[in-house]
From Swiss-Prot:
UniProt source species: Leifsonia xyli subsp. xyli (strain CTCB07)
Entry keyword Nucleotide-binding: yes
Gene Ontology MF terms in the entry: dCTP deaminase (dUMP-forming) activity; dCTP deaminase activity; nucleotide binding
Gene: dcd
Protein name: dCTP deaminase, dUMP-forming
Renumbered residue ranges of the record's region Disordered: 166-201
PANTHER family, sorted: DCTP DEAMINASE (PTHR42680:SF3)
InterPro entries per the UniProt record, alphabetical: dCTP_deaminase, dUTPase-like_sf, dUTPase_trimeric
Family to which this protein belongs: Belongs to the dCTP deaminase family.
Amino acid sequence: MLLSDRDIKAELTAGRLGLEPFEQGMIQPSSVDVRLDRFFRLFDNHKYPFIDPAEDQPDLTRFVEVVADQPFILHPGEFVLGSTFELVSLPDDVAARLEGKSSLGRLGLLTHSTAGFIDPGFSGHVTLELSNVATLPIKLWPGMKIGQMCFFRLSSAAEKPYGSAEYSSRYQGQRGPTASRSFLNFHRTDVSGTEAGRSSS
């Protein structure tokens, strides 16, 4: 069930849902606007010949902090990691989804490339996957509205929410944009037994 503005306010008041720092004016009819922090991670294209999700590549990105009153310039075709200004904390029975702002999308800014879903139990600053698909550079101002977060109540509380000992929960408690940690639980299925155009069953 998608939470309404009334539901979101009730969850915040009860302390079950956390958004820090929070401003009342950020609440929309069924979402909450989130803002851009001043921290970014830029890809260094000269450190590795290719990106391999199975390998630890610690120098793939470099950390950049911009002055709070100055913009970060995102060039056409560029992809960087950013993060929400807000620290987001979810209870065990609420999941969230980050969506871009329509007005920014019409300028060619993509807020997240794929990872918009946030598991129940998560706590941290949400990493943004920012892309410029326009033909001109885009100024990204720290503190600007960068996306909107909607919340979904689960039919029951998660048995093992994000952050549980059973899961690696690689991004729990993250501060600022966090580089990929896909190598920590990389999984690859053996597909050698299948033939093209035929089902394995």
